[in-house]
């Protein structure tokens, strides 16, 4: 990992790893089951999650000269509250869908953003077509983009932009998947669809 300002001389980083077992029937993605028209469902992030902190620190502290207790414009939060928002867990709303075989793929949106993470779960014959009007980029990300001089294409490849997880469901199951997510108080929405392509992400 590259985390400027975190690894100080004489300090060490201790990392933990979890190894698990999954039933073969539950493995995702199911590439052979994916087809044009399958629905992309977005789940919101709670903030930066684990990516974009070097940019955020540069913008907030170096460029804008903000303190941790200063308000972060447009967010209704302090800089500390916005940047230290806990990476939310998607286990509770998503695992029942996995166990019920309601999904054909899912992508955790980490470093690389939507542009790089979704293709990891796509066959080479399909593209993920993202409807950019389906959600509003949260104020935190808009602030970082504006003050950091980050264009939308670069932002899509560096930040989650408010989308923390993307689920892929068959078209005839998408409504039921959305209903289950909403019943679990998950504010999910239709983010886009799969179209013929080469395993990339396209924005509309």
Please place each PLM-identified region on the residue numbering.
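Glycine-rich anion-binding loops of enzyme active sites
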Residues: 1-54, 193
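Glycine-/charge-enriched secondary-structure boundary and capping motifs
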Residues: 7-14, 66-84, 88-204
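Acidic, glycine-rich loop-and-beta core segments that form the ion-binding/anion-interacting portion
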Residues: 34-81
